[in-house]
């Protein structure tokens, strides 16, 4: 890798650290190429991405960023997983690590907050942004639905009473 490629890599990583809300760092030693491809595929499906880069270049890219606290984790064969959704990268990484013990989650960062491995696992159990939005919409719609049911209930009861009288008279 020549100097220009290294500079381009650092700029790319800096842009990633500026645009993402969560970064997860993990050791990937012992993963086969097929397993790494599977990890990347699962990350893409979750709306996250995985990148492997030289630790020194990652540390340079981290300087001055909000997630600079993860620089200490960059030792050995590490990968970074990141996403715009605050929980997508953590969920995908933890799910893959459950099935494959060779992926060891070291920690990460969410904004300026540094996360240890347990915090990343806790983050993975939280609902995603889309799930929270769906719950919020459901909560907002619930009173309107109940109001509509209450308004329609008396008319329905009246119709059933009239129907019962009609059946009684017919018999």
From Swiss-Prot:
One of its GO terms (biological process) is translation. GO terms for molecular function: large ribosomal subunit rRNA binding; structural constituent of ribosome. It holds the Pfam family Ribosomal_L10. Forms part of the ribosomal stalk, playing a central role in the interaction of the ribosome with GTP-bound translation factors. Part of the ribosomal stalk of the 50S ribosomal subunit. The N-terminus interacts with L11 and the large rRNA to form the base of the stalk. The C-terminus forms an elongated spine to which L12 dimers bind in a sequential fashion forming a multimeric L10(L12)X complex. Belongs to the universal ribosomal protein uL10 family. This is Large ribosomal subunit protein uL10.
